[in-house]
Amino acid sequence: MTLNSRILPLAISLMVWLSGAPGFALSALEIMQRVDARDDGDNMTARQEMILIDKNNHRRVREMIIFAKDEGRDTRRLLFFLSPQNVKYTGFLTYDYNSGDKDDDQWLYLPALRKTKRIASSDKSAAFMGSDFSYADMTRRLISEWKFKILKEDEVRSKPVWLIEALPASDIIRKRYGYNKSVIFVRQDLFMVVRAVHWVSAGGKLKYTDMKTIEKIDGIWTATEIDVKTTKARKTLHRTILRFRDVKYNQMINPNLFTVRRLEKGP
């Protein structure tokens, strides 16, 4: 055997190992576990601007304020609409449980009716306040509810990403989230989801999510502009732009803020 015949297979193996290292050093599940474990602070406050754009490019702008706080392994979130007048002081409260044995709790307060509506699990795939986000999108996905597979590597805005397929682990999960499948783009240096495509169960629609702007705030990488659009047959049906400002982490937040009573009281 010649020297070249011994070296060539070794060189090819080394090239394959080096080029494949980012994709094969971790499994899809391990990557998503790191995404889930990424630091997002013990609590957070922010102002939000939600822009709703219909298929005729008509725009509606809504202003909101949001509070979030970890309670052990669970998370609680409270959101109030501040404008326009027709949704002013509408509130949304979520308890995210870090257990597949218990459904997340969600309540929507409608001040015009002076009524609080509890969101049933069967309704969580419905649109949240006319946006491209569903009620299920407003909660945190549990890793145990999905089956993951690495599809390939690519780049988003010149940064290496993994493309990971996420399939619901059961028909119950599929119905709850309203997605047959998702492809998630995870930035390799941050273990942060920066883009996603969702195959909507009803109506043959696709939903595209893009973290347009990412900033480091208080040491935490944060998506400060999120663009979501719903399409069918390659035509955009609706689009939602969500912009964050005045984001603050690890502030003093009263845990009594996250109650139905406080939801009904308003900001």
Model-derived regions, located:
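Bacterial N-terminal signal peptides that target proteins for export
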Residues: 1-11
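Bacterial N-terminal signal peptides
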Residues: 9-20
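Sec/Tat signal peptide C-region and signal peptidase I cleavage site
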Residues: 21-25
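N-terminal mature ectodomain segment of secretory-pathway/periplasmic proteins
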Residues: 26-112
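Ribonuclease/tRNase effector modules and their secretory precursors
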Residues: 33, 50-51, 58-67, 71-73, ...
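Gly/Pro-enriched, hydrophobic low-complexity segments
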Residues: 82, 93, 105-109, 117-119, ...
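Active-site cradle of extracellular carbohydrate-active enzymes
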Residues: 147-155, 167
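Short, solvent-exposed mixed-charge patches
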Residues: 266-267
